[in-house]
Structures are given as C-alpha cells and as structure tokens.
Amino acid sequence: MTNIRKTHPLAKIINNSLIDLPAPSNISAWWNFGSLLGVCLILQIMTGLFLAMHYTSDTTTAFSSITHICRDVHYGWIIRYMHANGASMFFICLFMHVGRGLYYGSYLFSETWNIGIILLFTVMATAFMGYVLPWGQMSFWGATVITNLLSAIPYIGTDLVEWVWGGFSVDKATLTRFFAFHFILPFIILALTAVHLLFLHETGSNNPSGIPSDSDKIPFHPYYTIKDILGALLLTLALTTLVLFSPDLLGDPDNYIPANPLSTPPHIKPEWYFLFAYAILRSIPNKLGGVLALVFSILILAIIPLLHTSKQRGMMFRPLSQCLFWLLVADLLTLTWIGGQPVEHPFTIIGQLASILYFMIFLVFMPIAGIIENNLSKW
C-alpha cells in the first residue's frame, strides 16, 4: 500500500512543500526567516481575529474599545500587545529576509523576488492601516499626513485623497474603511505567500555559496523542520519577553492620548519600521519629489536583478560587495534614527546624505563593485 502522504491530493501538496521537499544541504540560519514570517502571519491573523471581536471602528468608541480590551476582556491585554509587538517582529523578520535575498543573490529568482516585493508593499499597507485603528493622537495624525501625500499626484491628487478619506478629512468613514482593509489584507497576504512559495518551488532554494545544489539535496523533514521549530521557539521567546516586560517599548506615548483634530503632536512619526522610508520622504523639500523617493526606496528592489553585474551569484566570495552591503545596513539604521528626530539641523543634512547614499549604493556602487570583482578574479 502506498503512503497516503504521497497519494492523497491535499496531503501530496503539503508533502511536496514541507516534508519530501529536496533542500540544499548547506543553507544557514538566514534561511529561517521565511518560515518565521509564516509563523508571524498566522500569529497576527489569530490575535487580530480576537481583537476584531471586541473592537469598534467608530471614531467615538474606537479608543475606548481598545481600553476595554486591555482592562475588561480576559487576557485582552496580552492579545493586544502580542498583536502590536507581533507586527514589529514581523518587520524584523521581513528586513532579515530581504537582506538575505540581497546578500546571497536570491533576487535572480525574478518571479519569487517580484512577488516578494508585492508582499512587502501589502504588509506595509496593512501595518499602516492597523496603526490608525486605536484612534490615538499618532494614529489620527499619522493617517492624515501619510494619506495627504496622495495629494502630490498631479491633477487627480486632491480627488484621490478625498476618495480615500471618504470625506473632507480623516473621520469615521476613513476609520471604518481602514478597519475593513486591515481585516481583509492579511488573507490576501496569505494567498500571495502561497504564490511566492509556488514560484520558489519551481526553482528550488538558493544557498550561501550561490552554486546550484542539485547534486547535493537533503529532505526538508526532519532536517529543516527541526531547524525551523528552533527558530520559531526563539522568535516566540523574544516576542513574549517584549510583551511581558516592556510592551510599550516600540510604541509611541502620544498614542495613549485620544485623537484630537484640534491639537497637533510636536513630532508626527510612524512606527519604527517605517522610519527609514519616512526619513527619505522628509529629506526632499518638494512634496511630489519626496513621495516619489518614498515609493522608489522600496521599488528599487525590483530593478536589482537588472543591475547584477557580477559573475558570481551571492556575496560570499566578494569582499567589495560585502563592504557595500554592510554600508547599506548602517545607512538604513542611520535613516531609521533620523526618521524619529525633529526636522532641524544637523538631522536634516544627515538625512539627505543618508538618502543619497541609499540610492547610490543600489544604482551606482553595487554594479561597479561587481565589475571590479569580475576583473580582480581574472575571469
């Protein structure tokens, strides 16, 4: 009798994706973040579902419904903070996952990479709309500032903003639709993830050496299932430590003040994981220019496969490119810091220089480094 795992139509799909999947024998811990993102997504959907049972998307009651969840719902506080800090964990894993793709040349799987970019945009949109829902000061003003950026689009900008708002300002209609989108988007992310994996399994995984590993494959289970479970345990440990000891560490104190359209907070800023993009947006004095820079700061990932000049796939044996990669990491950390600072000297000029460096690394330095390394290796 043949194994049901290999014959049943549904079990067969799971088997070919998670059990008998041939995987390279040398993939490192940097390959753990894909599965960790899956864990984060499931956690966010589960906690979000329970929060949605008690949340009301009305401007008069949204803030007090969050208070009600934290005070009156059984373990509501832990569900709320797991959801809020789970988003931070999600983005940490996302940045690591994208960084891994850049370092080891995984972007050459263009279909997988492009679906990944769409996923990144979708997750960012979901997180932004989720931040608006508690209807605190930073929620309201963050929504106002970011949605207002659409008005920079020539000719249709103003109409577009009012269409998104559902009125002439951020109000009840905006909150209601943001809640609706915030609820549906994770399921769209889930579907896109399935497509992401579908394309990945067409080519198989990349590995640290960047050399095809067809001659040296091992089954995904038990080797990588154990490895992924260890990663998930460490992620859970980090998240529960954050939730139980300092749940508000990554949040903004202003969001504990109910939204007030008549009082602007001194420093409007998004959650920490958007600060790098926010710093790039602010570094350009022109509104449309800033919006374009903001969009291209993420969209630039789509043209990276076209700018790959090296004869080697990954950066494992390319010291010049390695230096540039870590310069990029340092630059992103600098931008994150600048995004949280007020718009004044010297932060403005640091932000502008860091923004220029960010685009220069991708568009100029990386391709040149690839050409230099090709010549150095005398191929």
From Swiss-Prot:
The chain crosses the membrane at residues 33-53, 77-98, 113-133, 178-198, 226-246, 288-308, 320-340, 347-367. Pfam families: Cytochrom_B_C (PF00032), Cytochrome_B (PF00033). One of its GO terms (cellular component) is respiratory chain complex III. One of its GO terms (molecular function) is metal ion binding. GO terms for biological process: mitochondrial electron transport, ubiquinol to cytochrome c. CDD domains: cytochrome_b_C, Cytochrome_b_N. InterPro entries: Cyt_b/b6_C, Cyt_b/b6_C_sf, Cyt_b/b6_N, Cytb/b6-like_sf, Cytochrome_b, Cytochrome_b_C_euk/bac, Cytochrome_b_N_euk/bac, Di-haem_cyt_TM. Keywords: Electron transport, Heme, Iron, Membrane, Metal-binding, Mitochondrion, Mitochondrion inner membrane, Respiratory chain, Transmembrane, Transmembrane helix, Transport, Ubiquinone. It is a multi-pass membrane protein. Heme b b566 binds at residues 97, 196. Heme b b562 binds at residues 83, 182. Its cofactor is heme b. Binds 2 heme b groups non-covalently. The cytochrome bc1 complex contains 11 subunits: 3 respiratory subunits (MT-CYB, CYC1 and UQCRFS1), 2 core proteins (UQCRC1 and UQCRC2) and 6 low-molecular weight proteins (UQCRH/QCR6, UQCRB/QCR7, UQCRQ/QCR8, UQCR10/QCR9, UQCR11/QCR10 and a cleavage product of UQCRFS1). This cytochrome bc1 complex then forms a dimer. Heme 1 (or BL or b562) is low-potential and absorbs at about 562 nm, and heme 2 (or BH or b566) is high-potential and absorbs at about 566 nm. This is Cytochrome b. The gene is MT-CYB.
